[in-house]
């Protein structure tokens, strides 16, 4: 029974019964023919995932994320946005710039003390915070995810692959294929 859609109206959701801990096999029957390819299937829910090489295990989802890739914090296939709440104490009034030089995402939106300062998307990955008064300042950074770890060619074994096209996914009969997951870092 169809129960809504995921990301795009063409990707239908089917409700599963409650799954209990342990080894679970889900069998899917679909039409398959020579010129067709199977598409990805996803198990969606409020749980985390650990990926070790080619092995994937459902686990409890992390309650909070630390700085570092969400891939290693039970969210390897999460491709939505991640908002970080942090802050600092300014010891004297000063003009400040924030640099976010290492984030995995399409861009990052920055707010300081609730004021939207704009986005960071290209080198040198800096944003002007302006004049910051003495005292505590809340900083909010939202990293906008990409769909790579969800829909990308995560079994392509070529590092720094220069071309993304149909054959980027169809690597099963070549040295480009690997059973392990090659995921991109997401978050800060």
Which residues are covered by each model-predicted region?
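Extracellular beta-rich ligand/substrate-recognition surface
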Residues: 2-7, 73-83, 117-123
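Glycine/proline-rich low-complexity spacer/linker segments in large multi-domain proteins
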Residues: 31-60, 144-188
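Short, surface-exposed tryptophan/glycine-enriched loops
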Residues: 8-25, 127-136, 147
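Active-site-proximal structural scaffolding
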Residues: 7-9, 19, 40, 81, ...
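Short beta-strands within extracellular/lumenal beta-sheet-rich domains
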Residues: 12-14, 78-90, 124-127
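Edge strands and adjacent loops of beta-rich recognition modules
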Residues: 56-87
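Solvent-exposed residues in well-ordered beta-strands and their adjoining turns
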Residues: 17, 29-33, 50, 89-91, ...
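Aromatic-lined ligand-binding clefts that engage carbohydrates, nucleic acids, or primary amines
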Residues: 1, 26, 88-90, 94-114, ...
């Amino acid at each position: 029974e169809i129960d809504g859609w995921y990301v795009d109206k063409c990707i239908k959701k089917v409700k599963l019964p409650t799954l209990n801990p342990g080894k679970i096999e889900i069998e899917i029957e679909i039409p398959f023919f020579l010129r067709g390819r199977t598409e990805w299937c996803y198990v969606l829910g409020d749980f985390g995932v650990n990926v070790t090489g080619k092995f994937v295990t459902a686990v409890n989802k992390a309650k909070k994320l630390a700085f570092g890739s969400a891939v290693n914090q039970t969210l390897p296939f999460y491709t939505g946005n991640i908002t970080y709440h942090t802050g600092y104490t300014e010891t004297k009034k000063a003009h400040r710039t924030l640099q976010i030089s290492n984030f995995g995402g399409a861009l990052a939106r920055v707010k300081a003390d609730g004021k939207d300062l704009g986005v960071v998307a290209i080198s040198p990955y800096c944003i002007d915070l302006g004049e910051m008064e003495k005292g505590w300042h809340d900083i909010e950074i939202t990293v906008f995810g990409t769909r790579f770890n969800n829909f990308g060619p995560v079994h392509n074994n070529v590092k720094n692959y220069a071309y993304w096209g149909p054959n980027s996914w169809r690597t099963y009969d070549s040295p480009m294929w690997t059973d392990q997951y090659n995921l991109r870092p997401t978050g800060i």
